[in-house]
Amino acid sequence: MLEYYDKDKMLVPIKIWTESIDDIEESCLEQAINLANLPFAHDHIALMPDTHTGKGMPIGGVIACKNTVIPNAVGVDIGCGMAFVQTDIPVNILRDTVTGSGELIKVIVGNILRTIPVGFSHYGKPQTSAVLDKAQSEIERYNADSELLKFIEQGYYSVGSLGGGNHFIEIQEDENGMACIMLHSGSRMFGNMIGQYFNKIAHEMNDKYFSTVPSEYNLPFLPVDTDEGQRYLNWMKLAMDFAFENREVMLEKVKHIFTEQVEKYTGITPNYSDEINCHHNYAALENHYGENVWVHRKGAIHAAEGEVAIIPGSMGSNSYIVRGMGKAESFLTSSHGAGRNYSRTGAKEKFSVESVMVDLRQRNVVLGKTSKKDVAEECRFAYKDIDVVMKNQSELTTPIKKLFTVGVVKG
């Protein structure tokens, strides 16, 4: 762990889990320094080893705030996170079983792609959602923000859908040769609209009350003891619950497809175990260094001592199931993935579609994607080396499972 602290420029220090300060983009460090100058920042800022420039706040960044929430420090994909389940099916069965449509793994990937809406698509009819039903039953909690109410209705069409960008569904292989299922998704357009809406309100409030936080930081904030702050917390919690349910429903759909196809072609019924579902974009009230503070994790996972969590790699690389070590200086946090080395545009300029597809074939990875033209955006070369990230956070988490991509569905 490194510490960066210029007392002439910063109110609190920045603690960083990289090999060198030079491993961090200049713009990312600048954003972290902005965080370190916020008057309500508590004790220090933490940067995980996958950190890179975000909107206002670095991805892979953690800030604990006194009596304050920052919509941009949560981000617009509120509640984005991971889900995982272990199976007892050997991967060689998926690769060696040949069907009329090719290897069984290809059939499973194809069925997932046809069943789960990806990218901007959604279901043609409303889905069941206990989270949204509950919100409807207590709608008075949300009526003050009438502009957002329509997104509750629209959310019914997105429950159990993947999205695009770095979201994925993977069939993976553990070190014992067994198949696993992992997915990455969030609150879809629902959380996006909530994040944008309250970021705008925070801007307006900060202007109205002559905030000392420079507007160019892009970190407008809401005191939690205001009506606006409480409304944001209500909506944020709703988006987090929606994101959790979205992953839960999607995982059940993928398990159903996996079971159906494995039974159909092998006669074997899979068993499932060790299910995990966790957020990596959110704020939570926690106690650190003797104070109750709002801990914002933007692209970072809670890693309390003994807590089991998911750290995915990039498409075609390794992923990890980890156990947290409860490091106080990281605010009980670790990285949420590998972290980008290239922007999406930069990756497409640097790596061709052909080179990415060749790499996936060489690694024996089956790709399910409706359009390959933007595949370079999410290739493993666009991201940091996940094994280096894991090494740099060896005091934050202990790996308990190492996983390898077998098949992947992307938006």
Regions found by a protein language model. Give the residues of each.
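Domain-length cofactor-binding catalytic modules of enzymes
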Residues: L2-Q31, F40-L47, T53-I59, I63, ...
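Short, solvent-exposed coil/turn linker segments
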Residues: I89-V91, S343
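Acidic, glycine-rich active-site loops and adjacent beta-strand->loop/helix elements
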Residues: T51-H52, C80
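N-terminal cap/recognition module
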Residues: T68-G75, C80-D88
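Interhelical loops and loop-helix junctions of multi-pass membrane transporters/channels
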Residues: Q127-V131
